[in-house]
Amino acid sequence: MNNIDQTELDKFEKMAATWWDPNGSFKPIHLLNPLRLDYIQQKANGLFGKKVLDVGCGGGILSEAMAKAGANVTGIDMTTEPLDVARKHAEESGLTIDYRQTTIEDFVQNQTACHAEKFDVITCMEMLEHVPDPLSIIQSCKALLKPDGVLFFSTINRTLKAYMLVIIGAEYVLKMLPKGTHEFEKFIKPAELLNWCDMANLRCQEMKGYHFNPLTEKFWLNNDVSCNYIAMLK
């Protein structure tokens, strides 16, 4: 199945060279990463020794953090340049991460049905709003999750607040992201995400909102999911 938006891929191909620059195009992800790693570790009861799949891994910011926490990480993405950056950075960091250029739908087809081929933890961060068919991604994640595994999705709510903060604020005013990184109509309401998860036989255990203070450059979590949010599912 071709669940790819080439325009979206091209955006991230162009930004690949700055992926690991903490003050570059991915500065917001670098700032957010410690918070989301801590959340994932807490809800997954630690990552050490666990088999983890990072879907839409890009240049590997979260993949590396999870590997440093002791996880056995596989990262998949359909971009070329960001994956090259991810492989090089992991090697320079002395980390072993299995990066593969594939869609998750094709990855599922190449896995066997046995329990050993499935994952304890699956992460899909800031990716669902960049694909034509989010449900297909969710169903594929479910197929790869162990019965006692934990799955995490993060995305952006389709609200006026999110439009003002993520597009106008982050892209045009603060210039933290390149203009055109996000398209408002592709943002996903929590009810839509939960409906797709229900169709995939996944149950939401918790949902939290990400929030950012541009003065302190700090992120925090609370129950307000009107902008960026993360969901934990089983």
Swiss-Prot record:
GO biological process, one term: methylation
One Gene Ontology molecular-function label: 3-demethylubiquinol 3-O-methyltransferase activity
Known EC number: 2.1.1.222, 2.1.1.64
Residues annotated to bind S-adenosyl-L-methionine: R36, G56, D77, M125
InterPro entries in UniProt: SAM-dependent_MTases_sf (IPR029063), UbiG_MeTrfase (IPR010233)
Reaction catalysis annotation: a 3-demethylubiquinol + S-adenosyl-L-methionine = a ubiquinol + S-adenosyl-L-homocysteine + H(+); a 3-(all-trans-polyprenyl)benzene-1,2-diol + S-adenosyl-L-methionine = a 2-methoxy-6-(all-trans-polyprenyl)phenol + S-adenosyl-L-homocysteine + H(+)
Keyword Repeat: no
Domain of life: Bacteria
Keywords (A to Z) from UniProt: Methyltransferase, S-adenosyl-L-methionine, Transferase, Ubiquinone biosynthesis
Pathway(s) the chain acts in: Cofactor biosynthesis; ubiquinone biosynthesis
Function, as annotated: O-methyltransferase that catalyzes the 2 O-methylation steps in the ubiquinone biosynthetic pathway.
The family this protein is said to belong to: Belongs to the methyltransferase superfamily. UbiG/COQ3 family.
Protein name as catalogued: Ubiquinone biosynthesis O-methyltransferase
Organism: Actinobacillus pleuropneumoniae serotype 7 (strain AP76)
